[in-house]
């Protein structure tokens, strides 16, 4: 994780998470709950003035997922009591991370999110793929840069 503080004010915070197989199911649920809970805690602290009248900080979330057969395979769904939303039917954990990250931004819990995937070999070489255009690293860091630029412009 990374926190950016400028002149004693919280400017930005980023969470970096990773997941590799084999137990994608449990870990996906844990990562989802953690992302939502962390953001909620930060925004509650911000609302309550814990950051000493800091302008609204920028919050980002980056996920590095192992690109393997298990992360790309459709997940089985049981519906004993209620129907699952259609967008989750027949999806892989990789696709579910896309849906999660988009919703984290849509719900304004995070300002931006990025999904990076890599095989074990790619990861060791520092290489990765970006399966979703709207969740790429470049717009993620451009969003952060824009926020920092706004903070700096307000200092002059």
Locations of regions flagged by a protein language model:
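Acidic, metal/cofactor-coordinating or nucleic-acid-engaging core segments within structured domains
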Residues: 23-121
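Short, histidine-centered active-site or binding-site loop motifs used for metal coordination
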Residues: 16-20
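Short, Lys/Arg-enriched charge-dense amphipathic segments
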Residues: 1-3, 70-90, 134-149
């Amino acid at each position: 994780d990374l926190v950016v503080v400028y002149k004693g004010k919280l400017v930005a915070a980023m969470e970096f998470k990773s997941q590799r197989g084999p137990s994608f199911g449990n870990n996906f649920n844990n990562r989802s709950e953690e992302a939502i809970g962390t953001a909620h805690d930060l925004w509650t602290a911000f609302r309550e003035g814990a950051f000493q009248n800091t302008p609204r900080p920028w919050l980002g979330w980056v996920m590095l997922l192992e690109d393997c057969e298990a992360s790309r395979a459709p997940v089985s769904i049981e519906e004993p009591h209620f129907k699952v939303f259609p967008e989750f039917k027949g999806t892989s954990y990789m696709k579910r991370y896309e849906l999660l990250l988009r919703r984290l931004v849509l719900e304004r819990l995070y300002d931006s999110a990025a999904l990076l995937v890599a095989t074990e070999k790619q990861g060791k070489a520092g290489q990765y793929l970006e399966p979703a255009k709207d969740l790429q690293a470049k717009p993620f860091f451009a969003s952060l840069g824009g926020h920092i630029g706004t903070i700096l412009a307000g200092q002059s």
